[in-house]
Amino acid sequence: MQQQVEPTLKNVLENQTLKWIFVGGKGGVGKTTTSSSLATLFAKSGKRTIIISTDPAHNLSDCFDQKIGSQPTQIKGIENLSAMEIDPTVDPDKLKLPTLQGFMNDQATKSLLSELISSVPGIDEAMSFAELMNSVDEMKYDLIIFDTAPTGHTLRLLNFPNIMEKGLNKLVQLRYNFQNLASQFQGLFGSQEEFDQQMNQMFSKIETMKDTVTKVNAQMKDRNKTTFIGVCIPEFLSMYETERLVQELTKFKIDIHNIVINQVLFPDDQCKMCNARAKMQKKYLDQMIDLYDDFHVVIMPLQENEVRGIDGLKQFCELLLKPKSVPQF
């Protein structure tokens, strides 16, 4: 089956307006290898690039064969490329929200913040993601690539702006509850006026974080600045998750027009088992090409060796830019 558009990622590299690239899909399909190779290509083109892993099971250190932590780390041997592995969850102590100094001791303040945050499921991750995006944006990289967690977690990330909006409304309601409580126990909290001032400071921070998420959300929906690259393998479950991802991204109005299919087998006269599996894969490949006829569907051959280190990534980079068709039998 003939593909309608070029089956490479050249279109992504040639886009001069992109700022954010998300790479995602089912677990174990080669997301980290794909995102790391793409980051390498951009860095070599002269763009100051950072790749960030939001997957709790980090693989960037293994992929680049060097230690990578929670702060930007320069990749050895690749100019313009940095990487970091971050925890997508957050500790309330690290949110930098103002405390109610003079009215409650530190432990009580932390308990209050924890209560506020835990009252809205998912808002802790939303706040963490907002802080992360804001911090990375301030680093002035030309391009930010996210190596995301498996599909379900990624879709939660995309829903964070809605969580923040709903969460803020609930926190505002709790705020008035605390104000009423303060009026009944003024001896503990101090004067109502002073308590209100401190509460205003704390909720001003929350409002600021919501503004950050709103700004990020606007950028994510701007196809000139943001795109998503789906990664899968030619098997039913992976194909199913890819379609789910495409539908959800479309619902969130986030651009996706590239899919990388890894671990593709080609005919081999010396291996009957390989040929049998390749024929099984071809059924799904044909379906993918037909379903995504207006996408850049990149077919990546199964690699003989594990892709690890700079040399391995360079070879993978070349394949991302080299057109390949569906195997024929």
From Swiss-Prot:
Compartmental location: Cytoplasm; Endoplasmic reticulum
| Positions with a binding annotation for Zn(2+) | 271, 274
Domain of life according to the entry: Eukaryota
**GO MF annotations for this entry?**
ATP binding; ATP hydrolysis activity; metal ion binding
Residues reported in the UniProt entry to bind ATP: 26-33, 235, 262
Q: Which Gene3D superfamilies match?
A: P-loop containing nucleotide triphosphate hydrolases (3.40.50.300)
Keywords in UniProt for this one?
ATP-binding, Cytoplasm, Endoplasmic reticulum, Hydrolase, Metal-binding, Nucleotide-binding, Transport, Zinc
What GO cellular component term, any one, is given? Answer: GET complex
Specify the enzyme's EC class, one word: hydrolase
**Pfam families under this entry?**
ArsA_ATPase
Q: Name one GO biological process term.
A: tail-anchored membrane protein insertion into ER membrane
Decide whether keyword Hydrolase is in the record: yes
Active site positions, chain numbering: 55
Q: What is its EC number?
A: 3.6.-.-
CDD domains, per the entry = ArsA
> What is this protein for, i.e. what is its function?
ATPase required for the post-translational delivery of tail-anchored (TA) proteins to the endoplasmic reticulum. Recognizes and selectively binds the transmembrane domain of TA proteins in the cytosol. This complex then targets to the endoplasmic reticulum by membrane-bound receptors, where the tail-anchored protein is released for insertion. This process is regulated by ATP binding and hydrolysis. ATP binding drives the homodimer towards the closed dimer state, facilitating recognition of newly synthesized TA membrane proteins. ATP hydrolysis is required for insertion.
PANTHER family assigned: ARSENICAL PUMP-DRIVING ATPASE ARSENITE-TRANSLOCATING ATPASE (PTHR10803), ATPASE GET3 (PTHR10803:SF3)
Q: Which family does it belong to?
A: Belongs to the arsA ATPase family.
Q: How does it assemble?
A: Homodimer.
| Name of this protein | ATPase ASNA1 homolog 1
Q: Which organism is it from?
A: Paramecium tetraurelia
